[in-house]
Amino acid sequence: MDVRRKVAAIGPNFDPDILEATRALYVPLIGKPSGPVKVTADVAYGSDARQKLDVYQPAALSDRVLVYIPGGGFVGGDKNSDGVFYVNLGNYFAGHGILTIVANYRLAPAHPWPAGSQDVGSVIAWTRANAKSFGGNPDRIILFGQSAGATHSAGYLFDTSFQPSGQPGVAAGILMSGPYSFQGELRPNLKAYLGSDQMKYAERSPLTHVSKNRTPLLLSVAEYDPAFLAVPTYELARAVTLRDGKSPKLAYFAGHNHVSTVMSFGTAQDDVGSAVREFVASVA
C-alpha cells in the first residue's frame, strides 16, 4: 500500500508537522462505516466546556462498549477536530456493532495533573450510568487510550485513588503508545501537565501504581514510534509481566507511526482495527 511507503519515509519521528503530514495521507482513505451508525454529539459529562463526549451507536444492541480517550500531547487534541478524526474511529467500531464513546478532557496548562485521569473516571462513570440507554452493556466497558490519552487512561486504571470504591468499573484496557513513567527534565508539554517539581513525578507516573490493578490489557507500540514514546510501552509490559508472572497481550504495528494507527480506522488498512476488534471480542 502506497501509504505504508509514505509513512516509512517519515520514519521514527513525531512532531506537529508529522502529525499534519500523516493526517493528510489518511483523510482521503477514510470510507463509510460498514453498518448504520447513529451519532449523539457533545454530551456533557461534567461542567467544563471540554468535558464532552460523542456517542456512536450501532443499529443493534452492543454487548461491549468501547470508550476512546484521544491523544494530543496533554495540551491539545480533540474528539472531532476536523470532521474526520476521530469520527473515523467512532464510525468504524460502531459500524462493526460496538457502542463507541469518544471523549474530550480538560487540558494543561489550565488543568494540570491529575485532571486527565480524573476526567477519564468521570467518562467511565457516565458510561456506566448511561450505556444501557444507548443499547450497550455497562459491565463490558473497554477503555482505550492513545498517546496522552493512554497516559490518562493508565493513570485511571492503575491508581485506585481515581476509582470509585477502588474499582475501575471497566472490563479491560487498551493502552496505545503512551508515556507511563516520568523523571528528570521533561518536555514543555509534559511539564505543563505534571508540573516542575521532579520529586512528584514518580507518584504521578502510572507505572508506579501498576501493582494495584489487574485489569486485562492490550498494550501496543507502532514501528515508527520514536524511542521516547516506544520505550514506555516495553517498560509497562515488563512491569505487568513481573506482576502477573506472564506477559500481557502486546501488539506491534508494523508500518505505522505514532498517529497512523488511530488514523487508519475506517480505511482499507485494517491491521490495527482488526487487532483491536479481536481484543474487544475476547473480553469476558
Predicted regions and their residues:
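Short beta-strand/loop motif that positions the catalytic acidic residue
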Residues: N213, L219-V221
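Catalytic nucleophile-loop/oxyanion-hole region of alpha/beta-hydrolase
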Residues: K79-L89, H96, I101-P138, T267
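Conserved alpha/beta-hydrolase "acid-adjacent" motif
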Residues: P226-E235
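Primarily recognizes the serine-hydrolase "nucleophile elbow" in alpha/beta-hydrolase
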Residues: S122-N189, Y201-A202
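Short beta-strand element of the alpha/beta-hydrolase
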Residues: D63-G73
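N-terminal cap/lid segment of alpha/beta-hydrolase-fold proteins
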Residues: A8-L61
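C-terminal catalytic histidine-bearing segment of alpha/beta-hydrolase fold enzymes
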Residues: S220, Y234, L242-A284
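Mobile cap/lid helix-loop segments that gate and shape the active-site cleft of serine hydrolases
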Residues: P28-G35, G178-H209, T215
